A protein has these predicted regions:
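Short, charged beta-turn/beta-strand-edge "cap" motif at the junction between a beta-strand
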Residues: 42, 46-52
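Short, basic/aromatic beta-hairpin or loop at an interaction surface
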Residues: 6-25
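Short, well-ordered loop/turn sites that connect or cap secondary structure elements
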Residues: 36-38
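Short alpha-helix capping/helix-loop boundary micro-motifs
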Residues: 23-33
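Short beta-strand-centered aromatic/proline hotspots
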Residues: 50-61
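Glycine- and charge-enriched low-complexity intrinsically disordered segments
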Residues: 2-3, 61-86
Length: 86
């Protein structure tokens, strides 16, 4: 499944381990791709050499969009680049 690929800061997680989708790189990617976030939306989130799939939720407590991810499923992107070239 083709999911939009959006920048996220993996150090900007809330107390529940969800990534906050409010940093400048995220906002720029969303704007450039003309994406409006909604609950349940599936995204691929990346930061430098890491990426992970996540589902969007709105955090009422913080009034910010977040993405629920499985921290054990984070992938190193350069591994996939090397495999694709082989």
């Amino acid at each position: 499944m083709n999911r939009p690929r959006i920048f996220a800061d993996f150090h900007n997680a809330d107390a529940k381990g969800r990534l906050r989708l409010n940093c400048i790189g995220t906002i720029e990617d969303l704007s450039r791709q003309r994406i409006e976030l909604h609950d349940g939306q599936l995204l691929t989130l990346y930061s430098e050499e890491l990426e992970v799939d996540g589902a969007v939720q709105y955090s009422e407590a913080e009034k910010v969009w977040v993405a629920t991810i499985d921290w054990d499923q984070i992938r190193h992107v350069e591994e996939y680049i090397v495999q694709a070239r082989s």
